[in-house]
Amino acid sequence: SEENAFFQISPVSESYLNYFNDINHDFSYVRDYMKRINSYLISEYHIDGFRFDLTKGFTNKNIAENYVSSRVDYLKMIANDIRDVDEDNYIIFEHFQGFEEKIFSDYGILTWGEENYNYNEATMGYASDLSGISYKKRGFKNPTLIGFMESHDKERLMYKNLEYGNSSGSYDIKHFDNAMGRMEAAGAFFFTVPGPKMIWQFGELGYNISINQCPDGSISEDCRVSNKQSAFQLDMDKGIK
């Protein structure tokens, strides 16, 4: 209802940052609620880390892309509350706001480092800049950037290799073996860069089922959350060298 102090019927911050009703992050009871939930998960279930989704939306300000000092202070407070329970707990923010990410890095907080487009351009055989995977490129002093090539939000590299891969003479990236070779090469320019990395499920096997594949095999964004066969159901693990 409109009287609910915890949830706002109409999100205050920018609409693309909100899904369903928006939590009123400025309300003191909400902040205490967050503190108690995180503390309980650590003490009761021994959770060793948290990844907070879309932390850029942890504000009632309608200027999410700008620097918001109150948001930074609030997120630091969440980190402090977690560390009061377990000082070694992993804290990850999916934030995507460059200046604030530098502040969080200096504070020992890990941040999400998406490089799907650039790596996929490279694996498909097109010119690309992979330097964004480096924490130094983003101006961080500490290796707190969790780099990734694929995620639950992004298309599979191998799928696009096979669909849109470049070619030169007899060499065609749409050929499966060549496409897999490109994935191996991408790994060499991914894992060797200092800093933590995230491998999205089955990415290490060259999983090539589109994120948008429908149960009937067609491709549509309406099927983004449709069930997909696992790599084990498809025997992809049988080809590991």
Feature map (PLM): residue ranges:
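Substrate-binding/active-site clefts of carbohydrate-active enzymes
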Residues: 1-46, 54-66, 77-86
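Active-site-proximal helices and loops of the catalytic beta/alpha 8
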Residues: 43-48, 54-155, 162-164, 179-181, ...
